[in-house]
Amino acid sequence: MGSPNKQGSHDCHGAPLGKDEIAATRECIGWPHAPFEIPAEVYSAWDGKARGATFEENWNARFAAYRAAFPAEAAEFERRVMKRELPANWAATKAAYIASCREKSENIATRKASQNALAALVPAVPEIFGGSADLAGSNLTFVKGSKGVTRSEGGNYCYYGVREFGMTAIANGIALHGGLLPYTATFLVFSDYARNGIRMAALMKQRQIMVYTHDSIGLGEDGPTHQPIEHIPSLRIIPNLDVWRPADATETAIAWTCAIERADGPSMLALSRQNLPTVTAKASDADIAKGGYVLADCDGAAKVTFIATGSEIKLALDAQAALAGEGIAARVVSMPCTNVFDRQDAAYRKSVIGQAPCVAIEATHPDFWHKYVGTNGAVVGINRFGESGKGPAVMAHLGITPEHVAKTALASTGCMRETPRMAAMPSRRRRAMRLAWRALRSQKRGADART
């Protein structure tokens, strides 16, 4: 509007008007002032300092009266909105809940572990405000203590309907308003629909927790339309987004507490549909909270280091045991949040990864992990879409097995040369084994070149 020759056309969108059209526009709207000259009457109309000071003075007076009439509510408002602090009993609540997870040592899906965490933490942190995109029963995000928002009544849980982007954008608005800590939920594969809202939460440094369940091909018969492949790697590279993929109930509890405590950005929890065993009995809370740590070390120097997350941690432990039977020492690193791990100091990161060749294991696209394993390591992942079938069968079909992990470690790192069993073999058999090892190395290089 106002550009006599370009208004109503695409020429006004994304391109300068040009000297002649600017002059014509000035004449059209009656603007005689020089460029960057702001008339005094316009400046005074837009200068909000004096008016703002009056508004602030009036608000402070109203809040003082409110505090006198409702001291408890005013203190809660100050804590949540003005100080942005968690409740005074938060540290004790957190420690007690994590300890209870360790005592139970349950084999449960991490989505169920997340539900248990919410049930314990929502009453302790009343500003938590949940919701799901029509999948509350599958995401397990509606817990005892949740109350759905209706047209006539308030609550702490919103049924957003099948609109992942709308849900995420609304939660961003709730976070920007202050006083509430929103979490949202859907299947991980549907994060594609929420992508811009996720990115904006990270860009604006807003506290939102995204609960994304059914995190891999392990979900089973829903098939490739519902089985995420590229999603976790692509979400990890969004700046300022912490992506957690916990391996058991304890890692899930710590992921939740870290997400609640984070003040400068959003967090995402990728959670399993299938049950997972307890694997962190000996891991410390502090190490897990660092995003990556040595879960199971070996005696002496490791010949290979396995790095895994979530449901693949058990595979790494089984592969470690298989290699130990061959006399090959392996270390297992659990890395539930690469983003948090990368923020640790260099000395800590080096102490966890170690000097041995690395094999990363995750039922996602493999490309992300090459920055950790380098050119001398390998990645056991999936660079194709999934299949419909029972979760374990699909995992086996796509090579996400302890046997394939151990085989990859042998083929990729040269560990086979070190095997004591080989040293005891007749020379002809040793030569045959070395030829097989070289063939595996060649096959691995060819696969790397193709991906």
Residue ranges and their predicted role:
Residues 448-450:
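Short, intrinsically disordered C-terminal tails of secreted or membrane-associated proteins
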